[in-house]
UniProtKB/Swiss-Prot annotation:
SUPFAM superfamilies assigned: Radical SAM enzymes
Name of the protein described by the UniProt record: tRNA-2-methylthio-N(6)-dimethylallyladenosine synthase
Domain TRAM: 380-447
Primary gene name: miaB
Catalytic activity field: N(6)-dimethylallyladenosine(37) in tRNA + (sulfur carrier)-SH + AH2 + 2 S-adenosyl-L-methionine = 2-methylsulfanyl-N(6)-dimethylallyladenosine(37) in tRNA + (sulfur carrier)-H + 5'-deoxyadenosine + L-methionine + A + S-adenosyl-L-homocysteine + 2 H(+)
Pfam families: Radical_SAM, TRAM, UPF0004
UniProt domain MTTase N-terminal: residue ranges: 3-120
Domain Radical SAM core: 143-377
Cofactor(s) this protein requires: [4Fe-4S] cluster
Cofactor note: Binds 2 [4Fe-4S] clusters. One cluster is coordinated with 3 cysteines and an exchangeable S-adenosyl-L-methionine.
């Protein structure tokens, strides 16, 4: 009987990428297949996030629930990976003695060896070292499950924002060699991938050697240009970028590379210079707006999403008003916004915070309501327009329909003959938008042809 692995992912897209790699590693080494049901699993892994306290505590809550599964199935192995693992290390085993494996983001490739050691010794295995970029040399080729794929181009972050735990859990910035990234993208394209999302904690800080050991360095703009030249790749996205690293070279790339989508996730975190300085973000609101102004001069249709932290220590009503003014001016399409959560070991955790939680919650609700109004307005403005979408597969709500994404990352569901589904999935097609819902669009296919290539550029 085929053994199975269950992975639960918390947090960012980097973690989603890492979770896929955990499955790939265990499939290549032990033949394990992925399952979505923990009760069916022989190995249960939690890929964790420590950016906010709530996410961290959720991990231990979930661990408590799977403990019962282990009691009923003694051979079951339980592992904790990701940023909580890096931060807590062996203390996870002290708190939850039934955990067998603790590994960081940089050591997931060692999972087969850790499993062997656990079985041989009967003792929990902990490996949260930072072996730089070593893991990419030991990962098996990716198994593609659709026309879109993530590609990690670097690890870590060297910005050390005062509130952020990432540099301590993922290490400083280390870029993969250019040829290594391009080889992975080309392999994905050969398997039918048409859209890649380049991943990194601070992706536009990419500085990769042209090849392993080379002294010549490629910047992020160069990487994008090379990826765009790979046959089969039709769209390029990236996340997450940092305003401080947004060079003129990268801005110019939006004029030179049509495959780079007109959608940008650029976290600003706050709209007050005073708070940005306390956060150690390294830019002002004016500098941030200058980047967006230059980009929209090249791509007037650029849609923009961001991250916002409400209730940072010392935030006044005036600071919050400045944040809201920026939200209105930038017309954000989406915002991942949260109340500030102090993380142990970060400088901001020691700052005095005298703002009542109910005030923070009220501000967050106001911010999120404003963003939702923006989302609805932008979605409504798309009704009646023809959008180019990448067809990803059957619709979740109705498998008789198909679903795809626009450049600005909107999900579009549309009817299509069942016989055409295999041909259309993975293709770039034109869809007329007929209706806007809160979190998706509905459209109609404009072109149906017996020749799949007729539905693409």
């Amino acid at each position: 009987m085929t053994k199975k692995v269950y992975v639960k992912t918390f947090g960012c897209q980097m973690n989603e990428y890492d979770s896929d790699k955990m499955v790939d590693v265990l499939n290549a080494a032990e033949g394990l297949e992925k399952t979505d049901t923990p009760e069916d699993a022989d190995i249960i892994l939690f890929n964790t996030c420590s950016v906010r306290e709530k996410a961290q505590e959720k991990v231990f809550s979930d661990l408590g629930r799977v403990r019962e599964l282990k009691e009923a199935k003694p051979g079951l192995l339980i592992g904790v990976g990701g940023c909580v693992a890096s931060q807590e290390g062996a203390s996870i085993v002290s708190r939850a003695p039934y955990v067998d494996l603790v590994f960081g983001p940089q050591t997931l490739h060692r999972l087969p060896q850790m499993i062997d050691a656990r079985r041989a010794s009967g003792r929990a295995q902990v490996d949260i070292t930072f072996p730089e970029i070593e893991k990419f040399d030991h990962l098996p080729p990716a198994r593609v499950e659709g026309p879109s794929a993530f590609v990690s181009i670097m690890e870590g972050c060297s910005k050390y924002c005062s509130y952020c735990v990432v540099p301590y859990t993922r290490g400083d910035e280390v870029s993969r060699p250019l040829d290594d990234v391009l080889t992975e993208v080309a392999g994905l394209a050969d398997q039918g991938v048409r859209e890649v999302t380049l991943l990194g904690q601070n992706v536009n800080a990419y500085r990769g050697a042209l090849s392993a050991g080379s002294a010549d360095i490629a910047d992020f703009a160069t990487l994008i240009e090379y990826v765009a030249d790979i046959p089969g790749i039709e769209r390029i996205r990236y996340t997450t970028s940092h305003p401080k690293e947004f060079t003129q070279r990268l801005i110019d790339t939006y004029a030179k590379v049509p495959k780079l989508v007109s959608h940008l996730h650029l976290p600003v975190q706050h709209g007050s210079d005073r708070i940005l300085m306390a956060m150690k973000r390294g830019y002002t609101v004016l500098e941030y707006k200058s980047v967006i102004r230059k980009l929209r001069a090249i791509r007037p249709d650029l849609s923009l999403s961001t991250d916002m932290i409400v209730g940072f220590p010392g935030e006044t009503e005036d600071d919050f008003d400045k944040m809201m003014a920026l939200v209105h001016e930038m017309s954000y399409d989406t915002s991942f916004s949260f109340i500030y959560s102090p993380r142990p070991g970060t400088p901001a955790a020691n700052l005095h915070d005298d703002t009542p939680r109910e005030v923070k919650l009220k501000r967050l609700q106001h911010l999120q309501a404003t963003i939702e109004e923006n989302v609805a307005r932008i979605s409504q403005s798309m009704v009646g327009k023809v959008e180019r979408i990448l067809v990803e597969g059957p619709s979740r709500k109705d498998p008789n329909e198909l679903s795809g994404r626009t450049e600005n990352n909107r999900v579009v569901n549309f009817p299509a003959p069942l016989a055409s589904h295999p041909r259309l999935i993975g293709q770039m097609i034109d869809v007329k938008i007929n209706h806007a819902y809160p979190h998706s669009l509905r459209g109609e296919l404009l072109l149906v042809s017996d020749d799949a290539s007729a539905a693409t550029h």
